[in-house]
């Protein structure tokens, strides 16, 4: 659970960064409980909704919160006693910034849209759907129902009239945005322009330091525990094992809806948990290095550089379609679009001399295409922000 705590702490750090943003109150979707659409502990789903105005009144951005996964009864029991498993424990207000920001100066293309942050409390990237409730621990695996209930509620609140719409997310929420992307588009009016944006959600089917793939076995447990198979894209599960369809690189092959991927080539979460997970690092040789790449040996840095090659290979399906977008920087970071500082700020990362806010906006409105890969080595981009060892 150490990595999960680290991920939560990074999200809390991000929340601190956006304290100055507009605080948007929480909405509890109590009507969803009767449909069985509930958090791990049985509490109601929740989201934060900042209504659109002016030219953005019929435009919508639905942003899925991140926060890791739980893989079995034990980790899900731990999770349900946190805000990632119970809406009863969530903060009542959330500061909107970055891609959700309400200021034209920092979010010029989307500032006046209807902006929604969907809280994450199921531990399955909104894919779980098991009818039976764990009798001993009172656990509910209903992430897919939460997703459907929230979308239905937003449709009733005006999203059925959407002219433009984006499904986005950070980390596990960004994975959810990819997995539900085509379904999101099919729910909205056929006349609407609908696209998806993944920020740090392109988790690759990568090899770890032993040559195996710890993340594959990890995701297989998530899919099995939550009964996620039937909620994953049929275009993928019809030809591959369901647990492999938790990986974006296989879903992207058949995705019909345009997707923009924001990712760090040296993603801090993936370096820690896909490349060098604690469970396979028996000698703890990577314990210090994976938290602070400046403390890696030359051999370890070569391995980290090799991970970038794996990332590029996994992104092939995204790069093969001109309708898709890609902002792949060479930073050691995770979830970069959630604060104004990194989304559009003067000191935020650039790729091809472009901030991510402009890259995504130009791509969405088709002012220009944007598929750019940063310089190849770690620390080669001077615009990369410093990354805390807790990120």
From Swiss-Prot:
The keyword Manganese does not apply. It comes from Arabidopsis thaliana (Mouse-ear cress). Pfam families: PAE. The active site is at 171 (charge relay system), 267 (charge relay system), 334 (charge relay system). Transmembrane segments: none annotated. It is an enzyme of class 3 (hydrolase). One of its GO terms (biological process) is cell wall organization. Keywords: Cell wall, Cell wall biogenesis/degradation, Hydrolase, Secreted, Signal. PANTHER family: NOTUM-RELATED (PTHR21562), PECTIN ACETYLESTERASE 11 (PTHR21562:SF51). It is found in: Secreted, Cell wall. One of its GO terms (cellular component) is extracellular region. One of its GO terms (molecular function) is hydrolase activity. Hydrolyzes acetyl esters in homogalacturonan regions of pectin. In type I primary cell wall, galacturonic acid residues of pectin can be acetylated at the O-2 and O-3 positions. Decreasing the degree of acetylation of pectin gels in vitro alters their physical properties. Its EC number is 3.1.1.-. The gene is PAE11. The keyword Hydrolase applies. Residues 1-23 form the signal peptide. This is Pectin acetylesterase 11. Disruption phenotype: No visible phenotype under normal growth conditions. Belongs to the pectinacetylesterase family.
């Amino acid at each position: 659970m150490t990595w999960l705590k680290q991920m939560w702490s990074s999200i809390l750090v991000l929340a601190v960064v956006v304290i100055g943003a507009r605080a948007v109150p929480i909405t509890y979707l109590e009507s969803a409980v009767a449909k069985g659409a509930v958090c791990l502990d049985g509490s109601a789903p929740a989201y934060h909704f900042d209504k659109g105005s002016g030219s953005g009144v019929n435009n919508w951005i639905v942003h899925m919160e991140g926060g890791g996964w739980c893989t079995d009864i034990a980790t899900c029991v731990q999770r349900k006693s946190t805000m990632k498993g119970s809406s009863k424990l969530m903060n009542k207000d959330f500061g909107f910034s970055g891609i959700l920001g309400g200021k034209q100066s920092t979010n010029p293309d989307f500032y006046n849209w209807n902006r929604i942050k969907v809280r994450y409390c199921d531990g399955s990237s909104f894919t779980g759907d098991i009818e039976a409730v764990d009798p001993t621990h009172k656990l509910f695996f209903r992430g897919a129902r939460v997703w459907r209930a929230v979308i239905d509620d937003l449709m009733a609140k005006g999203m059925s009239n959407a002219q433009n719409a984006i499904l986005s997310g950070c980390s596990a929420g960004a994975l959810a945005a990819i997995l539900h992307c085509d379904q999101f588009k099919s729910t909205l009016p056929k006349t609407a322009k609908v696209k998806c944006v993944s920020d740090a959600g392109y988790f690759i089917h990568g090899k770890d330091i032993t040559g195996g793939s710890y993340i594959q076995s990890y995701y297989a447990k998530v899919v099995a525990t939550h009964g996620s198979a039937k909620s994953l894209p049929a275009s993928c599960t019809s030809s591959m094992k369901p647990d492999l369809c938790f990986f974006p690189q296989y879903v992207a092959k058949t995705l019909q809806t345009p997707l923009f991927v924001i990712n760090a080539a040296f993603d801090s979460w993936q370096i820690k948990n896909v490349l060098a997970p604690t469970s396979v690092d028996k000698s703890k040789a990577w314990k210090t290095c994976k938290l602070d790449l400046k403390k890696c040996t030359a051999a370890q840095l070569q391995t980290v550089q090799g991970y970038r090659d794996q990332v590029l290979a996994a992104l092939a399906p995204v790069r093969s379609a001109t309708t898709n977008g890609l902002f792949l920087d060479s930073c050691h970071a995770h979830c970069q679009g959630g604060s104004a500082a990194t989304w559009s700020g003067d000191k935020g990362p650039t790729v091809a001399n472009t901030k991510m806010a402009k890259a995504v906006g130009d791509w969405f409105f088709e002012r220009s295409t944007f598929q750019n890969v940063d310089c190849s080595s770690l620390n080669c981009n001077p615009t990369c922000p410093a990354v805390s060892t807790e990120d």
